[in-house]
Amino acid sequence: MVQPYHAPPRASFLQKLGPGGAASLGLAALTVLGLAGLPWAYRLRQVLRGVHGDDLAPADAILVLGRRLEADRPTRVFESRLAHAEALWRRGLASRIFIAGGTTGKARLSEAEAGRDWLVARGVPASVLLLESRSQHTLENLFNVRADLRAAGWRTLLMVSDPLHLARARATARGLDLEVRCSPARDAPPARGSLAWLQRAALEAFLLHWYHTGMVYSRIIGSRQQLERVT
């Protein structure tokens, strides 16, 4: 079996791209430009549709996707994700909480460790929390969590992130054959309809298009390493 590429801790943008990443990024940009923005508009519709969904159901574990830290502390966006995961856990929708996210930027803690400390300070027992602290981005979050999930004999995840991120996270999880339901942290900034919100929606639409372009590109060129990374 070909070992998939994983970015090192505190990876640069080019390191995070990995083998084939720059090519698929270029293809994604070219298809958007060459087709007058239609692929981007289609993905934007998916991103905005995902804002409204809340697919609550009991699961084996709740998964909180990480976010880059500021001064070794969760940002408001990450805090909103964590608080929503805590609320779902207290409602009894799952008995364990996965927190995913490695060491990024200048942080001394991983995103998962900072998330654990935040939840423990709010009274969540440390024994409830499982950490995935090796990843550098959403794809690696889910790839590593999949291995941990299988090792524990679990199947279902209730995935938590901010609303604009969930369409891409859901697509990535399904590409990895994960059985996920999604619940958005609706109070996560930026405020809905603000300029920052619109900019984030536009970016997420392109990132979602890039992900799907990468899947198609990997299959066309028959790259086992690329396919092992995304499926």
Identify the function of each model-found stretch:
Residues 194-225:
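C-terminal capping/extension of enzyme domains
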Residues 2-9, 40-201:
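A structural signal for short, hydrophobic/glycine-enriched beta-strand patches
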Residues 1-60, 221, 226-229:
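N-terminal membrane-anchoring alpha-helices
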Residues 178, 229-230:
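Secretory/periplasmic and organellar redox-cofactor proteins
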